[in-house]
């Protein structure tokens, strides 16, 4: 929305104008009366003089109000009020000129009836140029031709809402909304960004000012260390950043050489770690040094580091008091419209716990910040659980879903849910330069290392481990006094430092999965050190339908193995996915691993540089506040028809592609499908995660009636799902080949 300094037509200025104008008018009328008998003056000259005076006055006012946008929708007391006033004055003047013109013609040429020269009635100049004052005052003459709404799928729905609800809050009228479609469109394009901007509208001065602030990469951590030093909760993350500092700085310099990091807007970013607040009840920071879960802390520390090195302004919050202090400008604002002026934040990275805290803190203002949210969500949130009313209709009782965000605003640990965005983390290399030289000299021993630091993970796995022990030694890093489930032949090293673990992995040929924990970082670390990973297969796949661990999580995703990412995106010779209960399959895999020689392998997306590249692309390209920005580019779209019983995720994956949910909107009309030779004899709208779809027998198409329900997950029993797939960069799954 454009914001302007209000202009008021003061009574003194108006009075001076009217007195001056009246005096000059009277003198000219007297002069005309005296002179008309001896030297008839042309009425057009008189008209020119009057209009010239008016033009000079209007020009002076225009200079005074140079930055004011005209129109009935620019807000109250702007130049449009002047336009209404002058419309009345000029209409009165033109009417008087018309009467004088008629009298002069009669005096000079005689009456129209006696005129000998006139053969055809000449239209009066006044009638040709007459202004409809009522139209000007009512704004009727303000033509509002709406631009195409392609790429703004929510625009039409928002306009319908405004027609019914614009009187529900006086703030809409303050922004110039007056009940007309044009005023709705201007508000929704300039204030809330749901619609395309009208081409004749001036740009928001605050938006233009924002672009003057550019991001510059950072190559030291001094400022970040100072920020994080204030929080004891950040101790583990701070130590991780220090250990990896050299690798991070080398990575940002390398990325800057490979792609242009100039002319990027410096964003104001809030990072709120809800899981570290006292109110959350979690003890993650306290248990980080005693065997507690580290996955979330790893991801948060890598995210904060990336945002900082990319040159953005970040503010970190780990308490409700800090959150309230940062957002104090909008806390308590009950208006349905956004706060005017400079933005407090432009992006918000948060977790599910923090999301509830943020919504409660902001109150009604929450709605204006929803599009800025990026939610760290390890296991992902599928559209079926994100859509509140749909989740309720399906009987889902998860406490983690029903946020009604764009599903791509949820950021996952691995690229397992294509409806979400893959944030990831960095696999740490715990070695210094002298270690790296030494580690390359280490010879691999005929030994394996079991992935499972808790005794309970080993339960009922002895037969499986016995097979492995037949061919090689079995080592472990189990902590705690309980070892009842660990076979006697296992050599247990206890808890090791990261550096010592790296050396142990370099001596090891096989990293052995037990089936739990699911989707952890350790297998990637082992593969990066040259181990092969024995990845347990799940048949049937594990999900919330058959596994307690997943009950309550906002996903129906099915895990086909302990580590689906390693299974799908890495594979052999680094990853061998086997059925633990199939002795022959396990033996064959172990023998093959012993007979092969493989080099260490690290997917680019799990390196410092890969994460910097991915996060920078998301910051620059992902935009959920301005309609549907076209990213990834449409050039990456490849359309596939799934067979009945097959999801879009599956059909894309079979073709070595990724399902891309942002492309669904381009497959949601009959004319869209014609490009891909899908002809609809009939069609309907339906609100469900399984559409758009096609029934080949009757050539019936079903299109999506609710944009939040577009989903790569879910299979239709009889219809073919119409699926948007895209390619991806090997080692950088989140990005298509044309995305950078």
Curated annotation (Swiss-Prot):
Catalytic activity: N(4)-{beta-D-GlcNAc-(1->2)-[beta-D-GlcNAc-(1->4)]-alpha-D-Man-(1->3)-[beta-D-GlcNAc-(1->2)-alpha-D-Man-(1->6)]-beta-D-Man-(1->4)-beta-D-GlcNAc-(1->4)-beta-D-GlcNAc}-L-asparaginyl-[protein] + UDP-N-acetyl-alpha-D-glucosamine = N(4)-{beta-D-GlcNAc-(1->2)-[beta-D-GlcNAc-(1->4)]-alpha-D-Man-(1->3)-[beta-D-GlcNAc-(1->2)-[beta-D-GlcNAc-(1->6)]-alpha-D-Man-(1->6)]-beta-D-Man-(1->4)-beta-D-GlcNAc-(1->4)-beta-D-GlcNAc}-L-asparaginyl-[protein] + UDP + H(+)
GO biological process, one term: protein N-linked glycosylation
Entry EC no(s): 2.4.1.155
Residues covered by region (Sufficient for catalytic activity): 212-740
Disulfide cysteine pairs (residue numbers): 144-182, 155-195, 171-337, 371-625, 648-723, 652-725, 659-712, 680-701, 736-739
UniProt-annotated binding residues for substrate: 377-378, 553
Domain of life: Eukaryota
UniProt keyword NAD, yes or no: no
Main location class: Golgi
GO CC terms, sorted: extracellular region; Golgi apparatus; Golgi membrane; membrane
Membrane topology: Single-pass type II membrane protein
Tissue expression summary: Detected in kidney (at protein level). Detected in kidney.
Pathway the protein takes part in: Protein modification; protein glycosylation
Cytoplasmic side: 1-13
Keywords, comma-separated and alphabetical: Disulfide bond, Glycoprotein, Glycosyltransferase, Golgi apparatus, Membrane, Secreted, Signal-anchor, Transferase, Transmembrane, Transmembrane helix
EC top class, as a word: transferase
Single GO term (MF): protein phosphatase inhibitor activity
Annotated residues for binding of UDP-N-acetyl-alpha-D-glucosamine: 525
Database matches in Pfam families: Glyco_transf_18, MGT5A_N
Post-translational modification, as annotated: N-glycosylated. A secreted form is released from the membrane after cleavage by gamma-secretase.
Transmembrane parts of this sequence: 14-30
Keyword Disulfide bond included in the entry's annotation: yes
Function, as annotated: Catalyzes the addition of N-acetylglucosamine (GlcNAc) in beta 1-6 linkage to the alpha-linked mannose of biantennary N-linked oligosaccharides. Catalyzes an important step in the biosynthesis of branched, complex-type N-glycans, such as those found on EGFR, TGFR (TGF-beta receptor) and CDH2. Via its role in the biosynthesis of complex N-glycans, plays an important role in the activation of cellular signaling pathways, reorganization of the actin cytoskeleton, cell-cell adhesion and cell migration.
Family named by the database record: Belongs to the glycosyltransferase 18 family.
PANTHER family with a match to the protein in the record: ALPHA-1,6-MANNOSYLGLYCOPROTEIN 6-BETA-N-ACETYLGLUCOSAMINYLTRANSFERASE A, ALPHA-MANNOSIDE BETA-1,6-N-ACETYLGLUCOSAMINYLTRANSFERASE
Entry protein name: Alpha-1,6-mannosylglycoprotein 6-beta-N-acetylglucosaminyltransferase A
Organism name: Rattus norvegicus
Gene transcribed to yield this protein: Mgat5
């Amino acid at each position: 929305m454009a914001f302007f300094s209000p202009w008021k037509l003061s009574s003194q200025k108006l009075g001076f104008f009217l007195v001056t104008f009246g005096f000059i008018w009277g003198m000219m009328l007297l002069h005309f009366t005296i002179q008309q008998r001896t030297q008839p003056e042309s009425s057009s000259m008189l008209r020119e003089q009057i209009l010239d005076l008016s033009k000079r006055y209007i020009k002076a006012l225009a200079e005074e109000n140079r930055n004011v946008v005209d129109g009935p929708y620019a807000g109250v007391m702007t130049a449009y009020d002047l336009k209404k006033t002058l419309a009345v004055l000029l209409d009165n003047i033109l009417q008087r000129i018309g009467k004088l013109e008629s009298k002069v013609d009669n005096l000079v040429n005689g009456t129209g009836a006696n005129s000998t020269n006139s053969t055809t009635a000449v239209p009066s100049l006044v009638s040709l140029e007459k202004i409809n004052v009522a139209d000007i005052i009512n704004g009727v003459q303000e033509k509002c031709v709406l631009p195409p709404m392609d790429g703004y799928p929510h625009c039409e729905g928002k306009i319908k809402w405004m027609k019914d609800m614009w009187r529900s809050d006086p703030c809409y009228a303050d922004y110039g909304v007056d009940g007309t479609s044009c005023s709705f469109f201007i508000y929704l394009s300039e204030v809330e960004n749901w619609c395309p901007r009208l081409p004749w509208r001036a740009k928001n001065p605050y938006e233009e000012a924002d672009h003057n602030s550019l991001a510059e990469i950072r190559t030291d951590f001094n400022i970040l260390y100072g920020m994080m030093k204030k929080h004891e909760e950040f101790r583990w993350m701070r130590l991780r950043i220090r250990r990896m500092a050299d690798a991070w700085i080398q990575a940002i310099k390398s990325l800057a050489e490979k792609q242009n990091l100039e002319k990027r807007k410096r964003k104001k970013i809030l990072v709120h770690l809800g899981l570290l607040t006292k109110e959350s009840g979690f003890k993650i920071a306290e248990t980080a040094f005693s065997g507690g879960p580290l996955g979330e802390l790893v991801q948060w520390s890598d995210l904060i580091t990336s945002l900082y090195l990319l040159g953005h302004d970040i503010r970190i919050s780990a308490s409700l008091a800090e959150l309230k202090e940062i957002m104090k400008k909008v806390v308590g604002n009950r208006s349905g419209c956004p706060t005017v002026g400079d933005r407090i934040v432009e992006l918000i990275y948060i977790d599910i716990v923090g999301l509830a805290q943020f919504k409660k803190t902001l109150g009604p203002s929450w709605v204006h910040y929803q599009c800025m949210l990026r939610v760290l969500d390890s296991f992902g949130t599928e559209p079926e659980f994100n859509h509140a009313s749909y989740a309720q209709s399906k009987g889902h009782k998860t406490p983690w879903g029903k946020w009604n965000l764009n599903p791509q605003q949820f950021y996952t640990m691995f690229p397992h849910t294509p409806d979400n965005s893959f944030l990831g983390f960095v696999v740490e290399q715990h070695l210094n330069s002298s270690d790296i030289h030494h580690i390359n000299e280490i010879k691999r021993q005929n030994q394996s290392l079991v992935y499972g630091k808790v005794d309970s993970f080993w339960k009922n796995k002895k037969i499986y481990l016995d097979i492995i022990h037949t061919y090689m030694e079995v080592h472990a890093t189990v902590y705690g006094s309980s070892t009842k489930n660990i076979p006697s032949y296992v050599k247990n090293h206890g808890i090791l430092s990261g550096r010592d673990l790296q050396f142990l992995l370099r001596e090891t040929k096989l990293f052995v999965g037990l089936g739990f924990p699911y989707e952890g970082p350790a297998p990637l670390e082992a593969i990066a050190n040259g181990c092969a990973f024995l990845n347990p297969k799940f048949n049937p796949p594990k999900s919330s339908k058959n596994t307690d661990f997943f009950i309550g999580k906002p996903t129906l995703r099915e895990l086909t193995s302990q580590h689906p990412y390693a299974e799908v995106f890495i594979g052999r010779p680094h990853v061998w996915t086997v059925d633990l209960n199939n002795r022959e399959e396990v033996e064959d895999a172990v023998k093959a691993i012993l007979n092969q020689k493989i080099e260490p392998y690290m997917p680019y997306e799990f390196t410092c540089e890969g994460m910097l590249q991915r996060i920078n692309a998301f910051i620059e390209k992902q935009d959920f506040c301005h309609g549907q920005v076209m990213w990834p580019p449409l050039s990456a779209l490849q359309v596939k028809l799934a067979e009945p019983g097959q999801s879009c995720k599956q059909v894309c994956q079979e073709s070595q592609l990724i399902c891309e949910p942002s492309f669904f909107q381009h497959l949601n009309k009959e004319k869209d499908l014609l490009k891909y030779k899908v002809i609809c004899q009939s069609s309907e709208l339906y609100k469900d995660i399984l559409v758009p779809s096609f029934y080949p027998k009757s050539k019936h198409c079903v299109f999506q009636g609710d944009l939040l329900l577009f989903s790569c997950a879910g299979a239709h029993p009889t219809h073919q799902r119409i699926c948007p797939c895209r390619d991806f960069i090997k080692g950088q799954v989140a990005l298509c080949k044309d995305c950078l």
